[in-house]
Amino acid sequence: MLNIKWIRENQELFDDKLRQRFIEPMAKRIEELDGKKRKITNLIQEFQHARKVKSKILGNINPKSGEEFEGLQRDVKDINEKLEELEQDLNNNNELNELLNTLPNIPDEEVPYGIDESMNKLIRTHGEVDLNAQNKKQHFELGVKLDLMDFEQTAKISGARFVTLKGDLAKLERALANFMLDVHTGEFGFLEVSPPVLVRDNAMYNSGQLPKFADESFATTNGYRLIPTAEVSLVNMVADTIIPREKLPMRLVAYTPCFRSEAGSSGRDTRGMIRLHQFSKVELVSITTPEESKNEHEYMTNASETILQKLGLPYRTMLLCTGDMGFASQKTYDIEVWLPGQKQYREIASCSNCGDFQARRMKARYKEFGSHDTTLVHTLNASGLPIGRTMVAILENYQNEDGSITVPDVLVNYMGGLQKITAYKE
């Protein structure tokens, strides 16, 4: 959620930032609604003070004193009725909060203006890409031919956008998760967490998924939602807390299943493992101070890139433009891995600095030692990485002419010494 005080004091800048996000100016409307809310709040405070004063006087008067006592009783009763009316008005005046809940984060000054992904800025590339490579198959062709990846029978069980992995591909999925967790915990100091994947609506609201993206998640019949990313569970570990400054940055990593309805993705990536309803992902989250969040963003992006470097996968890092950024982010890097079967780069990770946007929603603060003052933390998240898309990249980049898949060197030990994935044999 955005800072209403900042909006009041920076109306022109606020409207300009909204335009960069292709949203109509809202400052005047917000000022109007905020003014109404503040007026009601001030009246409530005045009446509460008057009630306190009159109640104190009433407590010091003999009930048998007659008109004075009865008059004060009537005054207190009238004040209570007025307070009830004002508090009802305040509760019904939800338009301001509803409006603020629909507004995305403000883009950082370094974010380029742009309409869509075609206007993202290239930051760096890593690894060699052979644009002229011939006869490179896509991952689903390879996996099905090896009889280690099943879509047809799985569709009878769960429908479209699901997959079943078997044999050495199932082992590769497990190996990738263990490898990623080892790198993030051992080399980058993230604390491994095993969080719940069923969360309440307020947790989804805190992280920015609700109310705007309700149709993109799966809801149960008893008030829970399946997480679209472990970011939801991890950032909410500090909801409604005050963290000692010396405990920051708080770096967390989790490996969980993720669930997405893929609403609005009809017709996109209908074949293969690129866009599934259920997939596994290693997720990074950091809770830090405003002064450190910029450097922490680079640190987390480096952690994600390191996984691809160790796997020997070519990639490029893009700074997203204003028209392509996520709702809660103020600055995002996308890491795109090269897929020779598709002859294009595809997103494999997003690394976002959300500033205090999520923290304001979930009331997450920190304070310096010996101080009574508190400050909103900054929250950051990064894919570290999605297992399925990483497997896609390995299949396409490490495929051999006979259809087998060479296991990347760093995964051989995780695969029990297996160096090549071949067709499944009964």
Swiss-Prot record:
One Pfam family linked to the record: Seryl_tRNA_N
HAMAP family from the UniProt entry = Ser_tRNA_synth_type1
Q: Which reaction does it catalyse?
A: tRNA(Ser) + L-serine + ATP = L-seryl-tRNA(Ser) + AMP + diphosphate + H(+); tRNA(Sec) + L-serine + ATP = L-seryl-tRNA(Sec) + AMP + diphosphate + H(+)
Q: What's this protein's name? A: Serine--tRNA ligase
Q: What is its EC number?
A: 6.1.1.11
Q: What is known of its domains?
A: Consists of two distinct domains, a catalytic core and a N-terminal extension that is involved in tRNA binding.
* CDD domains the UniProt entry points to: SerRS_core
The family line of this record is:
Belongs to the class-II aminoacyl-tRNA synthetase family. Type-1 seryl-tRNA synthetase subfamily.
The UniProt function text for this chain reads:
Catalyzes the attachment of serine to tRNA(Ser). Is also able to aminoacylate tRNA(Sec) with serine, to form the misacylated tRNA L-seryl-tRNA(Sec), which will be further converted into selenocysteinyl-tRNA(Sec).
Q: How does it assemble?
A: Homodimer. The tRNA molecule binds across the dimer.
Annotated Gene Ontology cellular component terms: cytoplasm
- A single MF term (Gene Ontology): serine-tRNA ligase activity
Give the gene symbol: serS
Gene Ontology biological process: selenocysteine biosynthetic process; seryl-tRNA aminoacylation
Binding-site residues for L-serine, renumbered to this chain: T229, A230, E231, E283, S383
Can you tell me which residues bind ATP?
R260, S261, E262, E347, I348, A349, S350
The alphabetized UniProt keywords are:
Aminoacyl-tRNA synthetase, ATP-binding, Cytoplasm, Ligase, Nucleotide-binding, Protein biosynthesis
Main subcellular location: cytoplasm
Top EC class per UniProt?
ligase
PANTHER family noted in UniProt = SERINE--TRNA LIGASE, SERYL-TRNA SYNTHETASE
What metabolic or biological pathway is this protein involved in? Aminoacyl-tRNA biosynthesis; selenocysteinyl-tRNA(Sec) biosynthesis; L-seryl-tRNA(Sec) from L-serine and tRNA(Sec): step 1/1
Q: Which Gene3D superfamilies match?
A: Bira Bifunctional Protein, Domain 2, Serine-tRNA synthetase, tRNA binding domain
Q: Where in the cell is it found?
A: Cytoplasm
